[in-house]
């Protein structure tokens, strides 16, 4: 029995070394997985490295995981001494097999705080663990801590160099944000309705992206295709609701500052903000009504193409509520100089609009470049923007017509039930 335990210990020590060696040979490993193998058939290492993929034969897990787990617990109980390299190797192996073991992440936090470990290493480790365990809450929690630590180090280094937030630091933070968006997208694709992944993405936009309008609009654009391919993913659509709500908050703040809606633009090319920063919000303009209408159009296409998905109807409810809130706030914030009073009439439609908003409603969009001879052509996506006036397409009546059309033409009982529920909610909002 004692000899068998010694053999197992020798085996797992070799496996830990093989995992460490694999990372040294190829620092660009981007995925980990288990290789189904009930028992060891050959006298070789169970660690397989093929290009940038790391595989672990399943037969060794029952020996490896308890070994590294107990070893780390003995260290925390001060019954076993492990040097820096041993701690890094043991926690790395353990977290690749069980990333929700909080103690291992806490040990690595201490190593980072002592300057022994670079937070970038933990971001790489977490990214790798998420390829196998994309919903791991402890991995996402530690990732946010490591990101805060990394950004703090970058800012402190810039201040020490008396460069304030130099362009290099800003570019580095922007690169971190882009990498996090990629990690979140990969994790969301590996696990349906990955709430932890989308919540992390929201956190990145809030704390690293500072809710910049540029980032918000870019994220709306970049996630459009994703949600179109995952029409039942509540978390993905909730993320788009967060983006639009954030843009709405910026618009409402602008009402307080200038007494009218931000200058609206009809040219699609100008919807994304300048890449060189945002010194002053009042100098920024974006077309929120246009973005909301685009979201409603996208939702309508998905509802027609994929009947019977409750997620789409819940999302439509949220977006129409944002439109309703925007128009109410805009009417309440209107001033005589720039607008005429605007309140919902008895039918639930907007009886009057600000002159600024009304001009957007009535003026055709310059999608053909008629006013600019330098513009040449336009894509099919821009062609699709030739539509009815915004006032009509965003009204209660238009929504009721849409619902009636769905109820008349659909053959899905689920679709009929969701449409009827949406109509009931719409009428309650109209009566409010």
Swiss-Prot record:
Enumerate the PANTHER family for this protein.
PROTEIN FARNESYLTRANSFERASE ALPHA SUBUNIT/RAB GERANYLGERANYL TRANSFERASE ALPHA SUBUNIT, PROTEIN PRENYLTRANSFERASE ALPHA SUBUNIT REPEAT-CONTAINING PROTEIN 1
Disulphide bonds annotated for this chain are none
Query: Nucleotide-binding among the record's keywords?
Result: no
Which family does the record assign? Belongs to the protein prenyltransferase subunit alpha family.
Alphabetized, the UniProt keywords read: Prenyltransferase, Repeat, Transferase
Annotated GO CC locations: cytoplasm
Q: Where are the PFTA repeats?
A: 86-119, 121-154, 179-212, 218-251, 294-327, 395-432
Give the protein name, as stated in the record. Protein prenyltransferase alpha subunit repeat-containing protein 1-A
Superkingdom of the organism of origin? Eukaryota
Q: State the Gene Ontology terms under molecular function.
A: protein prenyltransferase activity
């Amino acid at each position: 029995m004692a000899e068998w335990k010694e053999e197992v210990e020798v085996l797992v020590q070799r496996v830990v070394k093989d995992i460490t060696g694999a990372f040294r040979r190829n620092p660009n490993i981007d995925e980990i997985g288990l290789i189904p193998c009930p028992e060891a058939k050959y006298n070789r290492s169970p660690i397989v490295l093929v290009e940038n993929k790391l595989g672990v034969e399943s037969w060794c897990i029952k020996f490896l995981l308890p070994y590294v787990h107990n070893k780390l617990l003995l260290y925390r109980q001060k019954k076993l001494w492990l040097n820096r390299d041993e701690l890094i190797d043991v926690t790395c192996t353990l977290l690749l097999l069980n990333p929700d073991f909080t103690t291992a992440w806490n040990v690595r936090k201490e190593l980072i705080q002592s300057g022994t470990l670079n937070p970038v290493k933990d971001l790489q480790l977490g990214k790798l663990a998420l390829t196998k365990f994309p919903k791991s809450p402890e991995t996402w929690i530690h990732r946010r801590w490591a990101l805060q630590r990394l950004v703090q180090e970058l800012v402190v280094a810039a201040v020490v160099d008396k460069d304030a937030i130099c362009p290099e630091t800003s570019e580095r933070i922007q690169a971190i944000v882009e990498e996090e968006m990629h990690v979140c997208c990969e994790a969301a694709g590996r696990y349906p309705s990955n709430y932890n992944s989308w919540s992390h993405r929201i956190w990145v936009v809030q704390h690293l992206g500072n809710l910049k309008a540029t980032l918000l609009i870019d994220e709306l654009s970049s996630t459009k295709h994703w949600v179109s391919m995952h029409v039942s993913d509540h978390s993905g659509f909730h993320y788009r609701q967060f983006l639009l709500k954030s843009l709405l908050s910026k618009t409402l703040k602008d009402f307080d500052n200038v007494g009218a809606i931000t200058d609206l633009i009809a040219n699609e090319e100008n919807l994304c903000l300048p890449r060189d920063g945002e010194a002053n919000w009042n100098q920024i303009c974006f077309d929120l009504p246009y973005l909301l209408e685009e979201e409603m159009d996208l939702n309508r296409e998905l509802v027609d193409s994929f009947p019977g998905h409750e997620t789409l109807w819940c999302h439509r409810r949220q977006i129409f509520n944002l439109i309703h809130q925007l128009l109410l706030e805009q009417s309440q914030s209107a001033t005589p100089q720039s607008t005429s009073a605007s309140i919902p009439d008895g039918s639930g439609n907007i009886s009057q609009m600000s002159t600024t908003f009304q001009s957007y409603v009535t003026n055709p969009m310059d999608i053909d470049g008629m006013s600019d001879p330098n513009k040449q052509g336009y894509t099919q996506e821009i062609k699709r923007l030739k539509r009815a006036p915004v006032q009509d397409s965003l009204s209660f009546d238009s929504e009721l017509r849409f619902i009636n059309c769905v109820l008349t033409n659909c053959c899905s009982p689920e679709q009929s039930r969701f449409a009827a529920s949406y109509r009931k909610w719409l009428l309650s909002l109209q009566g409010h």
